[in-house]
């Protein structure tokens, strides 16, 4: 991995102060004289929800890969998470994992999950980034357009505190979420249409924050209930700060968890595994239950865009928005930021400066995007109502996924590898070609 940093004179402008934008600030600070982060929200001084993160009060998971990427960018950030009150969960010794009719063995795979709410993760990262001497975060600045001249992005503009503003820069990073605004800006600026891949998934989920019943105080067990097709319901329970739980119940299409407590509890009881219902029964709801709908997942293929402007880097959900059930968004964004840091170092070495930063960035960023996208898409495409192109070898991939699942239940080392792939620590190829491939292949026969 490239880690050398050579200072590049100039100014970097980042749109979005969520996990992706903050990670990008950490990645770029060593290369620029000034890094400016713009966000439309007023950012809270504590670990509080903010309006601009529409699903910020839903359950968010920082995968172990995301935790690792952030530690690379901000050494010591894990201690920051601990100071924010993170619950330490041993994967998978502290996990009750029900999937497709089977409960996985509770094995210690050698990894610790630091469980927090999304606002607490973001607050811990933001406080670190604020202390960087050449990084400034401007709140209440809503970007509504980008200016492109001679094939290069030269500025962004919008409204801040009811006044128009323009920000010039030498490099622009868009990390402003899953709404596709960057693609719209580029089309309006005359750069063309961004090719996209879209899956219509119609995922619904309801999340509540709960104080634990007395018998569960201090218990950091997490619960995962993925029944799989044909069942459309699922449940997740994760411990967070203040000895509380975030509990999310979800479904597809018309299958949705109610937003009243009795209905929510009954929905939990309807799951084919009772660990979540048992915990909800005596827990105390803190605040309202909130329901959300995610109609689709989208991948914007900026790398295939003939008119893609120089000096522009899309990052995180600006490249791909995933089914949130799989908890990949924050971690992919952090991985993109690591790819950006390495791309800046390579651009400096190339002698071409920032003009070829994107061509160094895209290969690694898109490799990570593809792994996350394919994991989520395979789960989505198993449901016949999901609209989107299925790969020609779809049935073969499903058979391999089932073989990996069975082998993981049987073998500790395969269980660990499956975890590492899901958490973006190892590539999928490690299951097909690595030293454990024979154990997985041995499980293929029953699928044929």
Enumerate the predicted regions with their spans:
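Predominantly flavin-linked oxidoreductase catalytic cores and closely associated redox partners
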Residues: 131-267, 271
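Short beta-strand to alpha-helix junction loop
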Residues: 61-62, 108-127, 181, 258-259
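FAD/FMN-dependent oxidoreductases across multiple families
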Residues: 115, 243, 255-360, 364-367
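N-terminal Rossmann-like FAD-binding beta1-loop-alpha1 element of flavoenzymes
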Residues: 7-39
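C-terminal helical "tail/cap" subdomain of flavin- and related membrane-associated enzymes
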Residues: 341-448
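Membrane-embedded alpha-helical bundles of multi-pass transporters/translocases
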Residues: 20, 31, 37, 78-94, ...
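Helix-loop-beta segment of a Rossmann-like dinucleotide-binding subdomain
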Residues: 99-118, 250-252
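N-terminal FAD cofactor-binding segment of flavoenzymes
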Residues: 27, 47-96
